[in-house]
Amino acid sequence: MSDQLQMTDGMHIIVEALKQNNIDTIYGVVGIPVTDMARHAQAEGIRYIGFRHEQSAGYAAAASGFLTQKPGICLTVSAPGFLNGLTALANATVNGFPMIMISGSSDRAIVDLQQGDYEELDQMNAAKPYAKAAFRVNQPQDLGIALARAIRVSVSGRPGGVYLDLPANVLAATMEKDEALTTIVKVENPSPALLPCPKSVTSAISLLAKAERPLIILGKGAAYSQADEQLREFIESAQIPFLPMSMAKGILEDTHPLSAAAARSFALANADVVMLVGARLNWLLAHGKKGWAADTQFIQLDIEPQEIDSNRPIAVPVVGDIASSMQGMLAELKQNTFTTPLVWRDILNIHKQQNAQKMHEKLSTDTQPLNYFNALSAVRDVLRENQDIYLVNEGANTLDNARNIIDMYKPRRRLDCGTWGVMGIGMGYAIGASVTSGSPVVAIEGDSAFGFSGMEIETICRYNLPVTIVIFNNGGIYRGDGVDLSGAGAPSPTDLLHHARYDKLMDAFRGVGYNVTTTDELRHALTTGIQSRKPTIINVVIDPAAGTESGHITKLNPKQVAGN
């Protein structure tokens, strides 16, 4: 009599496929039809981090992908849960972060005939415009190859978000266990090196060597590449001033003598040759137009050929992965050495010193209530002594001022709103950074921005994560002194509840809360929060009149011809 065959099902197969591909963490929100999948993943040793909203779970997965070069995994239920996570998936794609969103879905036979199934939605086709790729699995024997494809697509070339649709009937479908194991694919070399054209590398070095005022701009693609040592060696060998975009801060420490960040406007307006390293010439750099010299020549190092010539002609495109491209640039530099003219470095230093003095005056001015400058000065003092922390930052004025004031000393320690300038990333990124690294995280939040994902403080407390949330509370979106134009006593469109005590939220979840009104109180609370490794909220009372409309990008608001 033969032994009885051992059977398995789709949800066990997908979990085994995740394990065999070294996926160790899932971020998500459970419900029909994925609850048992999450339970089984946890039973198999995969960490499951449960959120209060799928969007934050997706942001956590994306942050994990950025920090590790492995796809972060987000798990959602069907239809509404899928749509909640879709914003995070799109944001990952736009920013170039590897992420896979796995969602349960309804019965295809009913959905395709629009017969009104539970949470009916054609999720795969809804995801396609916003993801790097989207796949649906219709039979359990395809789960292994589907996950393998999702992993490879998410990390190869320019990284991005991939959607994987798992209908409930596929999760429940059965297979003989030994046969199922043969269908699982372990991905080998998912992101192979893409070497640049040697002629392009030679041309790039030749153009830089002739430049009188060269500048290197480091983008988050450079940070993602983890080519930190090659970038440092190249910049220091050629003595080329560099300008980091916000999430590239710390590749070289912001206090490095070649950093041109404090003379950003002058550097952009006067550089004659600019080398973009994993940075896109998009709205964050005024598309290379306003504020730039008309005759600036560009070298662009990017993994995506379609990015070249997107806004300004690129004199020398160097297409390849950043690590390989920088290795080639270093080798060529050693064969054809040059040093940036001292006069260019000196004039940048003069402008840096002038701007630093102006900033010092703002930072050292004592006010009551606090403003962004003196409050961020206190934060900067504490973080200077805690350089291992991860910094998450979102808001308008809170983001823009913190980016300029707070120095970063190590790569990939700053996570912010990125290419889309999206609000709501704060708690998800903070949780993702904490879970991935095990290090303390400080989230510097505008009060409006915090509101997008504030309920995730329960998640932070439930997992006892070392996250300190600093909320700059001026009682409004941008500012808290808006005017009611209706005359009906209604709040202004930009006003929030004045005198809100966000620190009190921690009473509900057994975290720690501080309400601070002075820089000394802020320094003490932040130092204590970091050192204690306890979930902490610091409510920083800011002048309602502090800040400007839309922060540093007021000019993006359409101009009115008439009206209020």
Curated annotation (Swiss-Prot):
Domain of life: Bacteria
Protein residues bound to thiamine diphosphate: Y372, A396, N397, T398, G421, V422, M423, S448, A449, Y478
Residues annotated to bind Mg(2+): D447, N474, G476
GO MF annotation terms: ADP binding; identical protein binding; magnesium ion binding; oxalyl-CoA decarboxylase activity; thiamine pyrophosphate binding
Regulation: Activated by ADP.
Reactions catalysed according to its record: oxalyl-CoA + H(+) = formyl-CoA + CO2
Matches recorded under InterPro entries: DHS-like_NAD/FAD-binding_dom (IPR029035), HACL1-like (IPR045025), Oxalyl-CoA_decarboxylase (IPR017660), THDP-binding (IPR029061), Thiamin_PyroP_enz_cen_dom (IPR012000), Thiamin_PyroP_enz_TPP-bd_dom (IPR012001), TPP_enzyme_TPP-bd (IPR011766)
UniProt-annotated binding residues for substrate: I32, Y118, A261, A262, A263, R264, S265, N355, R403, N404, S550, G551, H552
Induction data: By the acid response regulator EvgA.
Pathway in which this enzyme or protein is active: Metabolic intermediate degradation; oxalate degradation; CO(2) and formate from oxalate: step 2/2
Necessary cofactors: Mg(2+); thiamine diphosphate
EC id: 4.1.1.8
pH dependence: Optimum pH is between 5.5 and 7.
GO-annotated biological processes: cellular response to acidic pH; fatty acid alpha-oxidation; oxalate catabolic process
Co-factor binding comment: Binds 1 Mg(2+) ion per subunit. Binds 1 thiamine pyrophosphate per subunit.
UniProt-listed NCBIfam families: oxalate_oxc (TIGR03254), PRK09259.1 (NF006721)
Record's function text: Involved in the catabolism of oxalate and in the adapatation to low pH via the induction of the oxalate-dependent acid tolerance response (ATR). Catalyzes the decarboxylation of oxalyl-CoA to yield carbon dioxide and formyl-CoA.
Subunit structure: Homotetramer; dimer of dimers.
Family, as annotated: Belongs to the TPP enzyme family.
Name of the protein in its database record: Oxalyl-CoA decarboxylase
Annotated organism of origin: Escherichia coli (strain K12)
The organism's taxonomic lineage, starting at the top: Bacteria, Pseudomonadati, Pseudomonadota, Gammaproteobacteria, Enterobacterales
